[in-house]
């Protein structure tokens, strides 16, 4: 199971909304990726829910209309989802909000899928610099405080190096481990410094009965999702076979019954399959991950489907 680029960039999924005029294209876009969903024609309530539950929102409508409705749910820079606009004729794909938080990448990927033109205007991408926000995504973390991000971008664009107290992932040419830079990103939060707040991770696994090599295949899926194994605290499942995943990660294991999952409510759960509905369930992997994470938990990876198992990841900021 190899995740698509969209799954790596938007693990909480992509919601597609449209005007009635754009519904046909909206439904098509909702099937473009394994983690994209057409959630319906626009209403304020539906957009608010999508903005809360998904990493990205695609609006199939005119740009002025999208700007007007997006203002209802957008907060500050870097808060809320990446928002992309696709005109109803499918000619242009335009990042509207949170360009560095994935809107630029999604616009380019969508444009490639439907033969449209992506309109990218931000400087960092034009210079080929990987955005800072991608660092947080790749490391399963949050950047705080967000009001400092703009000053870090100015330094990047001026050719300055930013120091870190961790080894940066590949692709961030402007970052290096060290202490002799004017600007730093650290995992230990200090006033006036951009902080990378790491998530403690909780993995939920759903599976058919007696799945062969479940532990091996689930571990491979976590590796493809670049989940930091050392930060997985608990693995949970309805199948005893998943205990091997926890053992391989050095994490705790909790076995759930289906009855423990039936009363769980969360607006951000993925639409259940017909099989789950017939069992009186709204989900398995996502519910387990969220129950393990507790009241402060956040769904970080919407359920990923293997051949005969599903996997989801929730997190709590450390």
Locate predicted features.
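Active-site microenvironment for binding and transforming phosphate-containing groups
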Residues: 230-318
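Conserved mixed alpha/beta catalytic, RNA-binding, or beta-rich assembly cores of soluble enzyme
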Residues: 2-9, 16-245, 308-318
